[in-house]
Design a protein with these regions (language model features):
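Conserved loop-alpha-helix segment in the C-terminal half of the alpha/beta-hydrolase fold
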Residues: 191-228, 234
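A short beta-to-alpha transition loop/helix N-cap that caps and shapes the active-site region
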Residues: 49, 91, 109-117, 147-148, ...
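Post-His helix in hydrolase/transferase enzymes
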Residues: 234-248
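Conserved alpha/beta-hydrolase catalytic His-Asp/Glu region
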Residues: 113-120, 131-191
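Alpha/beta-hydrolase fold catalytic core
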Residues: 1-13, 34-37, 71, 75-76, ...
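Conserved HGGG/HGGXW glycine-rich cap/lid loop of the alpha/beta-hydrolase fold
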Residues: 3-55, 59, 69
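Conserved acidic catalytic loop of the alpha/beta-hydrolase fold
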Residues: 61-78
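Conserved hydrolase catalytic core segment
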Residues: 76-115
Length: 251
């Protein structure tokens, strides 16, 4: 069972949420974007109302599922906008189905594979979530926001935690296992025939800003930098909407 929404007319735009999120993360953006575009939101495998497929959800598995939805909807080409893990899925999709891509936005995401340190962190997370599911989720979500915003956005953070707590344990572990073994896809940033936009947060606690700049050196990728954390869709909502609308105008 795959949960998705499809509304509006125009260029097809697929919104892909991140780890511990679901399609509700886009709700502030849809009313504006749907005025000029056909907006598809999808719950990724083991997240939201989409069921688990197995015990490891690779980025390719997720991409195949997205392709299946687009095929159902008879959509040949789409712009993919992915937050964090959603960006990894967008790049896996671009590798598997290059002819179906019209443009990509990587929001608080990276084309690079996990470092050894990140892989070890994923393994620790798998142990932690099995030991104490709710404490793991509450801590993980708070840590995605820049420290300066944790008080200002306390209500939103609480809401995000409640959405995250809907994610089944199997889905969480399968996503962590899948992200841990994902391929490096930096080559796509160098050779893609369509526009790509990278959106980074200066104070992203999860993705080091300076390390992430390196991947776009010598590419045509457009960079937008926000001053905040990993959750631009909440921390920099108005500015992000402007960036996304501008990108969609250009494709």
């Amino acid at each position: 069972k795959i949960s998705y929404t499809d509304q509006g007319k125009g260029t097809a735009v697929v919104l892909l949420h991140g780890f511990l999120e679901n399609q509700s993360m886009w709700k502030a953006f849809i009313p504006e974007l749907v005025k000029k575009h056909r907006i598809i939101t999808i719950d990724l495998l083991g997240h939201g109302a989409t069921e688990c497929l197995g015990y490891v959800h690779t980025m390719e598995d997720q991409a195949d599922m997205v392709h299946h939805v687009l095929h159902e909807l008879k959509i040949r080409k789409a712009v993919l906008i992915g937050h964090s893990m959603g960006g990894y899925v967008a790049l896996a999709f671009a590798e598997l189905y290059p002819d179906n891509v019209k443009g990509i936005v990587l929001q608080n995401s990276t084309s690079r594979a996990d470092s050894d340190e990140r892989k070890a962190n994923r393994d620790r997370a798998i142990v932690a979530v099995k030991q104490n599911y709710s404490a793991f989720i509450r801590m993980s979500i708070a840590n995605l926001f820049s420290e300066d915003n944790r008080e200002r956005l306390a209500d939103i953070i609480e809401e995000v935690k409640l959405e995250a707590l809907k994610t089944p344990l199997q889905g969480i572990v399968a996503a962590l296992e899948g992200m841990k073994i994902r391929k490096d896809r930096e080559v796509i940033l160098h050779f893609a025939p369509y526009p790509i936009q990278l959106i980074l947060g200066k104070k992203d606690p999860v993705l080091n800003y300076d390390d992430n700049l390196e991947q776009i050196e010598g590419t045509q990728v457009q960079l937008t930098t926000f001053e905040d954390g990993h959750m631009s869709h909440f921390e920099n909502q108005a500015e992000l909407l402007v960036v996304l609308s501008g990108f969609l105008k250009r494709v």
